[in-house]
Swiss-Prot record:
Name of the molecule in the record: UPF0301 protein Rv0038
Family membership noted in the UniProt record: Belongs to the UPF0301 (AlgH) family.
A cellular component term, taken from the record's GO annotations: plasma membrane
One Pfam family hit: DUF179
NCBIfam families listed in its UniProt record: PRK00228.2-1 (NF001269), PRK00228.2-4 (NF001272)
Gene3D superfamilies: VC0467-like
InterPro entries linked to this entry: AlgH-like
Length: 202
């Protein structure tokens, strides 16, 4: 049974058939490049111009208050900037999870991505948005691919394409999001969650 303040999509992610806005890219166990190792990327845009996403599980030590103090109140814990990727690290991008039943249409500064996820214009007034969103996450930089580049990496098995839950974006500071996403998948994919973090332990 779903509580009044919850939405069915909070618990059951729809099956991901292909890359699109609102899907996750999960780094495969063989992807050892430090920037993306065990990363979980939320796809914000995927179109003829390429693909843009943000890494959900790379918190920085920089407090949101020190960079964008007006957004600190709405920022989800741990209220730090997250490293969205290697592209334009001096630029900020913001995602928010809408409250159940909230409609982003007509709310200045919100652009719908998928489900209850929206992009937020950081020039908007946080006080105006507060009633519509559960929380925001602000990313320094993003991850980007040109046309065909991501498809090649997926064919090479660098990435696993999966569906997202709203809670993935606002995940807590100590959570192993990579493992959490895998554990909710059917067998045999869920077994990858047992893959050791430190390969030297294996």
């Amino acid at each position: 049974m779903v509580a009044p303040h919850e939405d069915p999509e909070d618990h059951v992610a729809p099956a991901a058939q292909r890359v699109r806005a609102g899907t996750l890219l999960l780094a495969n166990t063989d992807l050892l490049e430090p920037t993306f190792r065990r990363s979980v990327i939320y796809i914000v845009e995927h179109n003829d111009g390429g693909t843009l996403g943000v890494v959900l599980n790379r918190p920085s030590e920089t407090a949101v208050y020190n960079v964008l103090p007006q957004w600190a109140k709405l920022a989800a814990k741990p209220k730090t900037m997250f490293i969205g990727g290697p592209v334009k690290r001096d630029a900020a991008l913001c995602l928010a999870v809408l409250r159940v039943g909230a409609d982003p249409e007509g709310v200045p500064g919100l652009r719908h991505v998928a489900g209850r996820l929206v992009m937020v214009d950081l020039d908007a007034d946080p006080e105006v948005l507060a009633a519509a969103v559960e929380g925001v996450r602000i990313y320094a930089g993003y991850s980007g691919w040109t046309i065909g580049q991501l498809e090649g990496e997926i064919e090479r098995d660098d990435w696993i394409v999966l569906s997202a839950l709203p809670s993935d974006v606002l995940v807590g500071p100590r959570a192993d999001l990579w493992g959490q996403v895998l554990r909710r998948q059917p067998l045999p994919l869920s077994l990858l969650a047992t893959h050791p973090i430190d390969l030297s332990r294996n």
